[in-house]
C-alpha cells in the first residue's frame, strides 16, 4: 500500500458533528485522555458563546482557524552547497495541523487561567485577526514573501 493513501476520517465530534472540531480535540488530547480534551474544547466554546453573544462558537472557531492557517511557508533545499529557503504552498492537511499546533502553543503561553479560558481567548482573538497565533501566521507569510526570489528552486 502506498504511503500517499487516503486519510482515515475521524468522524464528527459529540456536540457539533464537525470533523474539524474532532481533529482539534484530538490535537488537544494528552496521554489518550480524550474526555478531558473534549471538556476543555467544549468549555472554551461555551465561554465564547457567553462572551460573544449572538455569535455561534462554531463559526468563531472556523473563522479563527482560517485566520491562523498559513497559505505559504518556507522549506529548506540544498542547492550546490548552499541552503535556500524556498516558499511553497501548504497542503490543506498541513495547514490544519499547523493551525492546531500554533493555537495550542500560544493558548498555553497565555496568563494563568484555565486552559478552556486560554483557548477561548486565543480563538476570539484569532477570529478578530489578533493574537499570537495570527502573528505567527503573518511571520511565516513574511518569511515566504522575503524569499520569493528563490521560488524557481521549487522541487
Swiss-Prot record:
Gene3D superfamilies: Ribosomal protein S7 domain. GO terms for biological process: translation. One of its GO terms (cellular component) is small ribosomal subunit. Keywords: Ribonucleoprotein, Ribosomal protein, RNA-binding, rRNA-binding, tRNA-binding. One of its GO terms (molecular function) is tRNA binding. One of the primary rRNA binding proteins, it binds directly to 16S rRNA where it nucleates assembly of the head domain of the 30S subunit. Is located at the subunit interface close to the decoding center, probably blocks exit of the E-site tRNA. PANTHER family: RIBOSOMAL PROTEIN S7. Part of the 30S ribosomal subunit. Contacts proteins S9 and S11. Belongs to the universal ribosomal protein uS7 family. This is Small ribosomal subunit protein uS7.
Amino acid at each position: 500500500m502506498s504511503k500517499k493513501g487516503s486519510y482515515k476520517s475521524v468522524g464528527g465530534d459529540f456536540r457539533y458533528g464537525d470533523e474539524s472540531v474532532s481533529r482539534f480535540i484530538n490535537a488537544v488530547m494528552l496521554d489518550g485522555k480524550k474526555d478531558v480534551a473534549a471538556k476543555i474544547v467544549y468549555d472554551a466554546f461555551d465561554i465564547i458563546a457567553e462572551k460573544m453573544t449572538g455569535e455561534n462558537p462554531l463559526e468563531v472557531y472556523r473563522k479563527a482557524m482560517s485566520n491562523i492557517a498559513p497559505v505559504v511557508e518556507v522549506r529548506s533545499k540544498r542547492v550546490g552547497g548552499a541552503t535556500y529557503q524556498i516558499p511553497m504552498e501548504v497542503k490543506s492537511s498541513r495547514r490544519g495541523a499547523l493551525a492546531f499546533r500554533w493555537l495550542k502553543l500560544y493558548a498555553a503561553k497565555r496568563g494563568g487561567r484555565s486552559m478552556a479560558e486560554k483557548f477561548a481567548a486565543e480563538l476570539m482573538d484569532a477570529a478578530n485577526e489578533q493574537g499570537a497565533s495570527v502573528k505567527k501566521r503573518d511571520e511565516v507569510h513574511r518569511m515566504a514573501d522575503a524569499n520569493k526570489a528563490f521560488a524557481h528552486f521549487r522541487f
